Every structure is written in C-alpha cells, then in structure tokens.
C-alpha cells in the first residue's frame, strides 16, 4: 500500500514537472520570436537580412557593431577607411612594439567581419541593379 501511494505521488510530480517544462519552453520560444521581431523593427532589416547577419556573426565570432567599435569606423562603410584603420591598429599592436597577439587577432577578426558585410552589401547592390535592368526592359 505505501508503494502505491509513493508511485502516485511520483507520477503526479513528474506530470507537474513535465507540464511546467513544456509551458516554459513554449513561453521561451514565443519571447524569442517577439524579440526577433522587435530587433528587425528597430534595425529596419527584413527577417532574411537579420538571419544573414546572425549567421555571419556566428560564423566569424564577432558582431558587426563590435567590429565597427574595434576599428573605429562609422556605418557608411568605406573600404579605404577600414583598410587604413586596420593597418594602423595591426601595426601598433605588433608584439615587437609592445602589443599582444590577442589584440592583433581582435583587430583581424573585426576587419574580417566588416569585409564580410561589405561583400554582402556589394552583392545586394548588384542584385538590385540587375533587378532594375530587368524591370526597365519590361
């Protein structure tokens, strides 16, 4: 008899935990979707652009915002400015001049992330030009 009662209590506790966990996961998914929608609205990006940025951030391990801060460049990205800032920061953080490999790698990763963004923007502008040509032909 005591085993039966203990089994009922254990089953009830397991059921309650399962329901609570299911509810928590469902709430977390809903909140994540809402946060993604708010982020897209705040940045003015489409969901696909947001996903592309997230993929690039994950692939390179650094966000675009952090990269811009490290290299001290502003958002109308200019390849020449990025290259100039990169070369300067990479040179002054040389180990022979008292810098560290860690700082050099941060500068390198920042430039790599900005280059990825510039490539993506160039590809997007080329696609827009092609689309405009097709629309003008019709």
Curated annotation (Swiss-Prot):
Keyword Protein transport part of the UniProt annotation: yes
UniProt biased composition (Polar residues): 44-56
Pfam family, one: Pam16
Keyword entries, A-Z: Membrane, Mitochondrion, Mitochondrion inner membrane, Protein transport, Translocation, Transport
Bilayer-crossing regions: none
UniProt entry tagged with the keyword Signal: no
Cysteine disulfide links: none
Principal location listed in the UniProt entry: mitochondrion
Gene Ontology CC annotations of this record: TIM23 mitochondrial import inner membrane translocase complex
GO biological process: protein import into mitochondrial matrix
Listed InterPro entries: J_dom_sf, Tim16
Protein's membrane topology: Peripheral membrane protein
Localization annotation: Mitochondrion inner membrane
Biased segments, Low complexity type: 32-43
Stretch list, region J-like: 66-119
Region (Disordered): 32-58, 118-138
Family: Belongs to the TIM16/PAM16 family.
Annotated function: Regulates ATP-dependent protein translocation into the mitochondrial matrix.
Subunit: Probable component of the PAM complex at least composed of a mitochondrial HSP70 protein, GrpE, tim-44, tim-16 and tim-14. Associates with the TIM23 complex.
Domain notes: The J-like region, although related to the J domain does not have co-chaperone activity.
Name this protein carries in UniProt: Mitochondrial import inner membrane translocase subunit tim-16
Organism of provenance: Caenorhabditis briggsae
